């Protein structure tokens, strides 16, 4: 089905790994310390964004005087301990396994590299990917194309010869901005 592509790129959270419930739990825990609230629909709309950008939206919603990068670090620490105990692969991992060795593959994620690498290794999936590009590897995050362009570069594949598997509107916009085809996994 994906034979015409020279490289396959996968978002991580919500696409190949079921991490979203744990991310929400970590946000609830961290925000509870500050008495802050968040809007679940607004959070879903920000799927694929780096943690600091989500923190900024929460701070603005609550009109709080906090540093979004510091709040993001707290959430990252909270989620790191939770995820290794709770994360499960999603069915799209079967696509990853079936294309292993047939095409170069990469992960392009809005998560921090330490978390992405730890999760993929923990689940025995890291060896399937030629590259992992995370939020701390690029200056401009999804919906900018930088994450996926760096994936293509690290795989040694032209961007127009890549397909991206995504579960978030920001990610699909980023793929298109990179000149890549996108598969919206929410429709599979």
Curated annotation (Swiss-Prot):
Purpose: Catalyzes strongly the dephosphorylation of fructose-1-phosphate (Fru1P) and slightly the dephosphorylation of 6-phosphogluconate (6P-Glu). It has low beta-phosphoglucomutase activity.
Residue sites binding substrate per the record: 11-13
Cofactor note: Magnesium. Can also use other divalent metal cations as manganese, cobalt or zinc.
Superkingdom field: Bacteria
KW Magnesium (keyword) present: yes
Keyword tags: Hydrolase, Magnesium, Metal-binding
Summary of pH dependence: Optimum pH is between 6 and 7.5.
Coiled coil: none
SUPFAM superfamilies (UniProt xref): HAD-like
Keyword Magnesium (UniProt): yes
Lineage, top ranks: Bacteria, Pseudomonadati, Pseudomonadota, Gammaproteobacteria, Enterobacterales
Matches recorded under InterPro entries: B-phosphoglucomutase_hydrolase, HAD-like_sf, HAD-like_SPP, HAD-SF_hydro_IA, HAD_sf, PGP-like_dom2
GO terms, biological process: carbohydrate metabolic process
Name listed for the protein in its UniProt record: Fructose-1-phosphate phosphatase YqaB
